A protein has these predicted regions:
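Long, ordered, helix-rich scaffold segments
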Residues: 1-445, 468, 474, 500, ...
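Flexible loop/turn segments at secondary-structure boundaries
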Residues: 22, 134, 168, 452-453, ...
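Short, histidine-centered active-site or binding-site loop motifs used for metal coordination
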Residues: 122, 458-459
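The canonical Cys-X-X-Cys-His
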Residues: 442-458, 465
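Active-site phosphate-binding and catalytic loops of NTP-dependent enzymes
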Residues: 488-492
């Protein structure tokens, strides 16, 4: 029907006008392609079928088809410039002015039919009301009544998005029901172990903003709802007043203390607590440093108000693979008085050794050297700034030799059992006749020992070693062979994943989604791990 000539379509339309509803719905569905703007005839057919009370066994299926026909007649749903993406499946592509003449009739029919005996039909009826931004108070009450603890979270989301499209004033009971649905959404998702898309917070934030636009008192109602204080609730603070924000933070603190070690900390919660200058709140924040998943976020917040009591945390943060965390820790240590502790100097040395000459990394290397100079009074010729963006083998070796000789016990502790072999290695390197070396034999060892799998080719897990002799000293290269984990650049630090059945995988994450992740291992295997 959609591909018919206009004259043929008009004839078909007149012929099916006296036919059974299913034929009329099918013809109108295909005929939508022949109509610009709102398809009044198709909409009339759809609303007639939706309103009818029939006893046929397939009446629900027919009404579902009619609901879809009504959506098509209204221009269908989809993305539009300037409209939040959360409404892509709930807002018509046609402008509001085109829908206004039919909004009342659509709302009246939906009100008469909703709720039906079929959940799927109810979803489409609600979508119709959302498309025309129904202003019918009865529908708002009916849709809000579906926000109940017994419904699936997907159903809650559907009706929350629907009511966000209804521009009517809310009463106190409606406000509380909306707030309870928002606050309880994450708990439902967690209980059912449902996966959440990486764009979840963005879409939920858009939904919340629209709900608040219809009800300015909703943020406070959310704050006063029992159960408020989970990490997913932080985004609700975006619409809270400045006066309510400290109260909200106190509610999070109470929730954390009540849950104890079971509280699911997140970076957002850490940042929220970091806004407080309260000593007890900061103490609670420091306790989260023991959790690996938020340790970086904790250090970032503590660095904003550098205190000597956190020095050991800043030193530990120097091992982070995050350059942002590393930068904050260096900045905090630079603000604190000079110290000569072994752990701090060797952690700073680790930064100097593992970072490269790229602009951002060299900037951090230079800052680490400046703190070392202040702490030790030594210089060793390391060049900071733009001119220093080269390997600087001699300076790095001098710093390494000085600090390892100054702090031998801490060096052994950090390097582990392999540290005992370093003196022997250094003596052997001195005795080797380097002029008698054979490159071809080296290539054979490089291949046979499996080094090639990680350090050569486009699928390599580690850095390509071509030209490495020009970037590192001979001693450093052999030390890296003996202690391969000593100086690992942040870009090549791997992730260890343990599955529920006890299997362990180690590799670089090359792709991550809501359903799982893909690892590339040192044996050049690409493994997909499902959640």
């Amino acid at each position: 029907v959609a591909r018919m000539a206009e004259a043929a379509w008009r004839r078909i339309r007149s012929l099916v006008a006296r036919r059974r509803p299913r034929a009329r719905v099918a013809a109108a569905w295909g005929g939508r392609a022949h109509v610009e703007g709102v398809d009044r005839d198709g909409l009339a057919v759809a609303l007639e079928v939706l309103s009818a009370k029939r006893s046929e066994s397939d009446v629900v299926g027919l009404k579902l088809e009619a609901a879809r026909l009504a959506e098509l007649a209204l221009g269908d749903v989809g993305p539009a410039k300037g409209r939040a993406a959360v409404f892509d499946g709930y807002a018509a592509l046609l402008p509001a002015a085109a829908l206004s003449p039919v909004s009342g009739e659509v709302s009246r029919v939906v009100d008469a039919v909703f709720p039906s005996a079929d959940p799927e039909l109810d979803i489409e009826l609600a979508r119709l009301a959302a498309m025309v931004s129904s202003a019918r108070p009865q529908l708002l009450s009916k849709f809000l009544a579906r926000l109940d603890q017994g419904f699936h979270p997907v159903s809650d989301l559907h009706f929350l998005i629907t009511v966000a499209r209804i521009p009517l004033q809310r009463n106190s009971a409606q406000r509380k029901r909306t707030a309870a649905a928002l606050v309880g959404l994450q708990a439902k998702i967690d209980r059912m172990s449902l996966n959440q898309d990486s764009n979840w917070d963005d879409r939920l934030g858009e939904l919340y903003a629209a709900l608040c636009a219809n009800d300015k008192q909703l943020p406070r109602a959310v704050l006063e709802t029992p159960g408020f204080g989970l990490p997913s609730h932080v985004l609700f603070l975006q619409r809270m007043s400045r006066e309510d924000r400290p109260r909200a933070r106190a509610t999070f603190v109470a929730a954390i203390r009540k849950a104890g070690e079971d509280y699911p900390w997140s970076g957002e919660v850490v940042r929220l607590l970091g806004e407080s200058g309260d000593a007890q709140t900061l103490k609670l924040l420091r306790s989260a440093h023991e959790r690996v998943d938020v340790r970086g976020s904790v250090v970032l917040e503590l660095a904003r108000r550098t205190q000597g009591v956190d020095r050991k945390r800043f030193v530990a943060g120097l091992q982070s693979s995050s350059l942002a965390v590393l930068s904050s820790c260096l900045g905090a240590l630079a603000k604190l008085p000079a110290a000569r502790g072994a752990r701090e100097q060797l952690a700073l040395l680790s930064v100097v050794r593992r970072l490269g000459p790229a602009a951002q990394e060299h900037g951090l290397r230079s800052r680490a050297v400046l703190v070392l100079r202040r702490n030790t009074g030594k210089r060793f010729g390391f060049v900071t700034g733009e001119k220093g963006r080269v390997a600087q083998q001699t300076a790095v070796a001098a710093w390494t030799d000085h600090l390892e000789r100054t702090y031998p016990e801490e060096t052994k502790r950090l390097l582990g059992a392999a540290a005992a072999s370093l003196p022997v290695l250094r003596k052997r390197l001195v005795a080797v006749d380097w002029d008698g070396g054979d490159v071809s034999r080296g290539k054979q060892v490089f291949t046979k020992r499996g080094c090639v799998g990680c350090h050569q080719g486009r699928r390599a897990l580690g850095p390509d070693l071509a030209g490495s002799a020009g970037r590192f000293s001979r001693a450093d290269l052999f030390t890296a062979i003996v202690l391969p984990n000593r100086d690992v650049s942040p870009r090549y630090q791997t992730t260890v994943v343990q599955t529920s059945d006890g299997r362990v995988y180690n590799g670089l994450i090359v792709y991550q989604s809501v359903d799982g992740l893909t690892l590339r291992t040192g044996t050049n295997r690409t493994i997909r791990l499902e959640k």
